[in-house]
């Protein structure tokens, strides 16, 4: 194992925690900045591996991107300013980069190939290939398995009205980004509203985009073709998916009080906070503000006695990445927690139904995997264990937090995988002990 990390139990976590910038917003700020006229300045950018993959791809297409300790400056070249890359575009481990870029690249007048690591190249890309092909894109899976590597040739795009079978922000975003270049208007309807960062940011960059929640609960985003986007200043809020680990740590660990600073609380992402409240958590939002359409706040968390809850339906897309952490909270809570409608977990960095179940069972929890989620009987004391992260950053972090309240030490294998989204995670965790 590359990097085993031993986590000892503790109590009394205290302090103020700065959360790294939101991953979704960081990716999109680079992409839109590159396609805009003028410069885009980005502060609190997430310098994790995934977002650096996005930067690398645009640099390969002739976009100058300056990195200083304070900010990132993207020198945009306008909607038609990208140039053909000399080599394969390396998307690393980043599904966001791959799926969103597929929409942008489909509209370019050059051929490109995107490829990533073994995990990325096994994740499903048919969900973007299908709608983009309907728009006139020439996009093929090199190995014929509907996965990356993806080869994209120039195509004349036309607008479509697409109904997505999944509430996936990445699918929606790929179509909307392609729609900027299409002949005619484009709409995407999804079964429930997924993350809407793309819509909010496109609007702030000057695109003509509208969003509606339909009477039946489905959500439609509608974009018109765009002449130009214009560079913006963006202060990226803290990533609630990263904040979730410290919120959970404050709730689960005895005698704790943490202030988690500058967290994005966009309603399409804040399902985790709703679940915490439903479980009886002592959570207070302070210093709420709004910038670039994205709300943010500091979150004050105190140790709480939690109880079980049911998580399903439209709530799922607002907390999909937090489910491993929620499962840990459920194991420490009194009563039963049921998670369903979350089959999407199977196609994340790992099959998170399986990896969460394995890790929780190894610590002595009572968890039953289901086809679209899991059932957790809480209230059993957990003990330290050897946890295989399977190189999944969310598993590594969720079980590092689980370890704090367990009986005995826990070893997390391959803990360096947290670098994908939260390189300072273990340092900050040690700092609040």
Locations of regions flagged by a protein language model:
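Structural preference for solvent-exposed beta-strand-turn elements
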Residues: 1-433
